[in-house]
């Protein structure tokens, strides 16, 4: 990417600029990462799967799915391709990818880190295991549908725009659920923020 983009080799799709050979390499690396992660989960000795691993699982699966679907292209040369989608379908797939790649790459990944490190550093369990279940499934269910909010007042059908907007507004619920769980896990251990690097 550091070489191909300055040389002008790009698909012209926001957040998905890389051409097909690089997309294939990224997919192979990500699938290898998934094999290592799920292989480790599969061979664990402890029956329980820690909450953080749910978020890492969603992070890995969602980013792989998003990258592979959005990168479906017809190569016409070594560093030139055209999207497998056209028109409003291309825009919808692109913003399903653009919104969720950021959402799952950053949000789910960082929440996994939070659900691991905050309880560990606070030396206490997660405040509410039940809230973490609700937080996880609410995030997974609502985030995937929020991409169309990037396409308001476009050729995208009104129902899809409304659905995207509705699910974007609903995202406050998992956001607050995770925040409450993190803050309440730290409750009584606020000195850790000051004393523990």
State what each model feature region is.
Residues 1-4, 26-36, 60-70, 112, ...:
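Helical transmembrane-bundle signal
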Residues 6-17, 36-54, 72-94, 107-134, ...:
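Juxtamembrane membrane-water interface segments of multi-pass membrane proteins
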Residues 19-29, 95-108, 162-174:
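Alpha-helical transmembrane segments of polytopic membrane proteins
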Residues 21-24, 129-145, 155, 159-162, ...:
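Catalytic-domain carbohydrate-binding cleft regions of carbohydrate-active enzymes
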Residues 22-28, 48-62:
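Membrane-interface loop-to-helix entry segments
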């Amino acid at each position: 990417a550091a070489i191909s983009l300055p040389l002008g080799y790009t698909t012209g799709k926001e957040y998905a600029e890389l051409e097909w050979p690089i997309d294939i390499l990224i997919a192979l690396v990500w699938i290898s990462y998934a094999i290592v992660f799920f292989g480790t989960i599969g061979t664990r000795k402890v029956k329980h799967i820690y909450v953080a691993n749910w978020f890492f699982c969603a992070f890995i699966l969602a980013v792989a799915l998003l990258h592979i679907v959005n990168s479906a292209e017809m190569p016409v040369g070594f560093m030139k391709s055209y999207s497998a989608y056209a028109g409003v379908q291309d825009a919808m797939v692109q913003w399903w990818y653009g919104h969720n790649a950021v959402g799952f790459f950053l949000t789910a990944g960082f929440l996994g880190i939070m659900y691991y490190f905050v309880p560990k550093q606070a030396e206490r369990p997660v405040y509410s295991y039940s809230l973490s279940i609700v937080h996880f499934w609410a995030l997974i269910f609502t985030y995937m549908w929020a991409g169309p909010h990037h396409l308001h007042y476009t050729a995208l059908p009104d129902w899809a725009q409304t659905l995207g907007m509705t699910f974007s507004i609903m995202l406050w619920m998992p956001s607050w659920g995770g925040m409450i769980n993190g803050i309440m896990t730290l409750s009584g251990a606020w000195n850790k923020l000051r004393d523990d690097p």
